[in-house]
Every structure is written in C-alpha cells, then in structure tokens.
Amino acid sequence: MENIGIDVKKPERTCNDPKCPFHGNLRIHGQIIVGTVVSTKMNGSIVLKRESRRLIKKYERYETKISKFHAHLPGCIDVRPGDRVKIAECRKLAKTISFVVVEKVN
C-alpha cells in the first residue's frame, strides 16, 4: 500500500507485519502526534512522551504537562529511546495501543 493518507516518507525497509500502515492492511485516521520515544522494551510497541507548556497567569510561571502514549512499532521503522517520531491514530490494536508509528522525525 503506497498512500496511507498523510504526507510522510515511505520506509526503505519492508516488513510482513499486518499491522503496518505501509505494508499491511491497517488504516489510519484521526490524530497525528509528534513526541519523543521513552521506551522500546515492549515487543513491537513503544511508549511515546509528549510535553506541552502552558502559562499560569496568577503566578507568572509555566507549567509543563506530560502525556504518554503507547504505539505499535512496525518492523520497517527503526527507532531508539530519545528519537522523535510521528504517530497516527488507528483502530484499537491492544488494550492500551491505538496508535501506530508512521515516521521518524529528525
């Protein structure tokens, strides 16, 4: 499958993963999130961290909020902890996984 519906580079490697949006039959829709990989210890999945800052006017300070997402990692994309990646929403793949990694961002 060539076009997955968003503007990302197709991975150079191929895989036989049916849950891959590029080489399998997984459709993506909804949110697209960019964040930092925290952990790759799960088999075929990653934990992603997204930080956002907001101003608290009363104290004239910024507050940092951290959100963690679990995402499926296809075999054709190689990531390590600390890398920035783009994930896209898909159908629920496991109890806590409803996103899939689509691109490694520099």
Swiss-Prot record:
Pfam families: Ribosomal_S17. InterPro entries: NA-bd_OB-fold, Ribosomal_uS17, Ribosomal_uS17_arc/euk, Ribosomal_uS17_archaeal. One of its GO terms (molecular function) is structural constituent of ribosome. Coiled coil: none annotated. GO terms for biological process: translation. SUPFAM superfamilies: Nucleic acid-binding proteins. GO terms for cellular component: cytosolic small ribosomal subunit. Keywords: Ribonucleoprotein, Ribosomal protein, RNA-binding, rRNA-binding. Part of the 30S ribosomal subunit. One of the primary rRNA binding proteins, it binds specifically to the 5'-end of 16S ribosomal RNA. Belongs to the universal ribosomal protein uS17 family. This is Small ribosomal subunit protein uS17. It comes from Picrophilus torridus (strain ATCC 700027 / DSM 9790 / JCM 10055 / NBRC 100828 / KAW 2/3).
